[in-house]
């Protein structure tokens, strides 16, 4: 079933919904970010990963500074319409540390 942006429940978490970013080819989870309605509209319009930066309090496109962009192949919405997956083709590392994925640390036992 296809959903519209207006069906996404942005109000449940104060205007933001989590976005899991996953490599469309390898299926590796690259990162977790957040989107608001405006950044999701930009992602749909441009085909690039757009997010809302909670730390900088502004819109940002992945790769706008690093060049490591993510081309969106598909956007999936969960059953409650309060979480999203971007299936992407990354052009470089997803993590600002230079790692391919942001989930490269293990929690101590």
Which positions does each model-derived feature cover?
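C-terminal binding/interaction regions
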Residues: 2-16, 22-30, 35-109
